[in-house]
Amino acid sequence: MLKGIEEISATKKRLKIEIPADIVEGEIQKALKEIQKKAKIPGFRPGKAPISIIEKKFGKEAEADVLEKLVSESYQKAVKETKIKPLLPPMAEDAIDIKRNEPLSFELVVEVRPDIENLNYDNIEVEEISTEVKEEEIEEVLQRLSKERGTYEPTEEPAMSEDLVVIDYTTDIGKEAKDYIYKLGAGPFPEDFSKAIEGKKKDETFSVTIDFPEDSIADFAGKKVNFEITIKEVKRRQNIPLEELHKELGFEDSDSLKKYIRQSLENAKKEQALEKQKFDILKKLLETYDFELPEGLVEMEMKRITEEYESLGLDITQHMDKISERAKRNVKAYILIDLIGEKEGVSVSEEELKQEIMNIARRYSITPQGVVQYYMSRDGSLEALQNSVFERKVFDILLQKSNRIKKEEAV
């Protein structure tokens, strides 16, 4: 059936396929007989209408079904025979039609993964990054947690930034409020409003004029407003004493809390170090190897990135160069990872895929079914998840083969 293969470029092949006339006709007759079994023709019992009548009425339908079947089957056989690795569905440059009692001849253009000669990824230099956790880092976390878990308590001291104040106010434009709770420095009023309150104490009353910008809250936008403000209460955040923090967070003692913080920081540092090393390895590979990129794959990636930009409300006309550059980089990275994975015999088993689903479910506190539904909703398959596991396994190999150097030795 495969008559030949023509190399259009490093990323495109033309498959020339011919299916003998007798096979085509045999498939058409099979299709007509299947239709005959179900067709309802006036004057004939189901399944008893002559094949000539079936062909006259349903011939074009049968030919269309057969054409789709034969093109698909012959393409799959040609791919196996030539051992090419298509990246996208094939494209027919010309219309493909069945002509009765003639061979079915057609050509399909296929985008394929380019080959890279002498692909070498041994001893790529990566920086050995320290993941040691220092005591001051633990102390910083403790102080932050102490502040976050603290409560606002009344104070007789003058108000300062980040305090909560309870105020009454009236204005010369008829707007007023009672028992209005406001955090100094946090909006929605301009900074000058907070600055006017800072330094004032409980029970003080004062006046201040504030210029509101056009994009401010609706009642005051674009106006110069005079406020008369009475401070009814000032509250300041009181941090939880460090010696009591472990109880608030459900730990047995302070040492247990510190141990947990240390482990969390260490895990985060290890993850950051790993991502940095993976980035450096990929950067080196991208700089080392230059090859033709499959146009269709680049276009598809550009479309995906464009949709991502649009979802963020960005004007894509101002970012086309960046989108194009990013798409080419992503496709190039995909091809390099795929080639290395193939060379190393990397595959993703059903068990590994299930384990990845379980890991994601635990990480985000959702059910495994929820993970599957999320990926299936994107493109109807788990291919993206499988690719993620494949990529991770490839990078594990690259890291094992890398040359770790200390920071001071890094070039």
UniProtKB/Swiss-Prot annotation:
Compartments, record wording: Cytoplasm
List the SUPFAM superfamilies hit by this protein, alphabetically.
FKBP-like, Triger factor/SurA peptide-binding domain-like, Trigger factor ribosome-binding domain
Q: Cellular component GO terms, alphabetically?
A: cytoplasm
**Where do transmembrane segments lie in this chain?**
none
- In short, the EC number is 5.2.1.8
One BP annotation, GO: protein transport
- Enzyme class, top EC level, equals isomerase
> Which comment does the entry carry about domains?
Consists of 3 domains; the N-terminus binds the ribosome, the middle domain has PPIase activity, while the C-terminus has intrinsic chaperone activity on its own.
Q: Which PANTHER family match?
A: TRIGGER FACTOR CHAPERONE AND PEPTIDYL-PROLYL CIS/TRANS ISOMERASE, TRIGGER FACTOR-LIKE PROTEIN TIG, CHLOROPLASTIC
Instruction: Sum up the protein's function in the record's words.
Output: Involved in protein export. Acts as a chaperone by maintaining the newly synthesized protein in an open conformation. Functions as a peptidyl-prolyl cis-trans isomerase.
Q: Which NCBIfam families match?
A: tig
Tell me the protein family, please: Belongs to the FKBP-type PPIase family. Tig subfamily.
> Mind telling me what this protein is named?
Trigger factor
Q: Which organism is it from?
A: Thermodesulfovibrio yellowstonii (strain ATCC 51303 / DSM 11347 / YP87)
Organism taxonomic ancestry = Bacteria, Pseudomonadati, Nitrospirota, Thermodesulfovibrionia, Thermodesulfovibrionales
